[in-house]
């Protein structure tokens, strides 16, 4: 029996991205494998018709998944016993794809998002759920932390916030963890201004913030230094071969979302 899911605004995007991953997984030559997403979509009583038609959103989600999965896996191979903090997790299932490669994994999100996650995913260790905002200092009190290396993932969130909110999130991270790396997805100001996702039309979710590159982000987040910057063009290359050509065009790379890797100053 399917369970009815009522979501509005930003939390609605978590259902849309889940569907995108499930849709790709079901393809014959799928570029990702997210069987949990497939099973969750089967259980959800939700109208996915808009998401089904929003190819731009689907390609973006899959490209991001390809790139971030690769980056997170490489990081965890180099850093044993890492504590992972996944901010604005929604219905993300990366913790299962990376199973056995981390010490503890904390999925953090707002109450309305976590209410839905808890309906379908029981996480009691080494994956845990924290029902709080990433701008609430107290969420770190729920993390079992003893000076271990920490990896923070911020995916699909910053474009819905403002600069004050971004600074608050990074300030909490900086104050709370000794050795910490942040992998954060950013959107270009051009896309923020000119693009609207078809799949969330009519919702309260709107793009509100972006930066051109890592240098611009570092000027805002001075306590961290940029270590790496990866365009989602790298993921698009595996979905659409034409991106091996057009991905070399500076304008294309500049307006594509990026994963920026930042480390706290020692």
Summary of predicted features, one role per range:
Residues 189-205:
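Short, glycine-/aromatic-enriched active-site segment of Class I SAM-dependent methyltransferases
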Residues 152-153:
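A conserved beta-strand element that flanks and buttresses the S-adenosyl-L-methionine
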Residues 138-147:
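Short amphipathic alpha-helix with an adjacent loop that forms part of the alpha/beta core around
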Residues 240-266:
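Core SAM-dependent methyltransferase catalytic element
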Residues 204-234:
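Short alpha-helix
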Residues 176-189:
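Conserved beta-strand signature within the Rossmann-like core of class I S-adenosyl-L-methionine
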Residues 1-85, 89-132, 145-146:
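Rossmann-like AdoMet
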Residues 160-173:
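A short, conserved alpha-helix within the catalytic core of class I
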């Amino acid at each position: 029996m399917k369970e009815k899911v009522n979501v509005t605004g930003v939390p609605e995007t978590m259902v849309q991205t889940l569907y995108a991953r499930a849709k790709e997984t079901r393809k014959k030559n799928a570029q990702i494998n997210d069987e949990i997403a497939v099973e969750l979509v089967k259980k959800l009583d939700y109208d996915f018709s808009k998401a089904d038609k929003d190819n731009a959103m689907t390609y973006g989600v899959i490209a991001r998944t390809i790139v971030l999965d690769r980056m997170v896996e490489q990081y965890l191979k180099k850093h044993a016993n890492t504590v992972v903090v996944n901010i604005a997790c929604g219905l993300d299932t990366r913790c299962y794809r990376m199973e056995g490669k981390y010490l503890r994994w904390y999925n953090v999100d707002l109450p309305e998002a976590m209410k839905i996650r808890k309906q379908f995913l029981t996480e009691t260790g080494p994956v845990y759920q924290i029902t709080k905002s990433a701008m609430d200092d107290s969420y770190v009190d729920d993390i079992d932390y003893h000076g271990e290396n920490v990896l923070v993932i911020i995916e699909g969130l910053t474009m819905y916030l403002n600069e004050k909110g971004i600074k608050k999130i990074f300030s909490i991270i900086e104050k709370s963890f000794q050795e910490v790396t942040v992998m954060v997805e950013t959107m270009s100001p051009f896309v923020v201004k000119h693009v609207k996702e078809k799949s969330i039309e009519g919702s309260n979710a709107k793009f509100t913030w972006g930066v051109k590159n890592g240098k611009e982000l570092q000027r805002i987040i001075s306590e961290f230094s940029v270590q790496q910057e990866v365009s989602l063009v790298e993921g698009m290359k595996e979905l659409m071969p034409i991106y091996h050509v057009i991905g070399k065009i500076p304008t294309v790379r500049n307006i594509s979302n990026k994963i920026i890797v930042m480390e706290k100053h020692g």
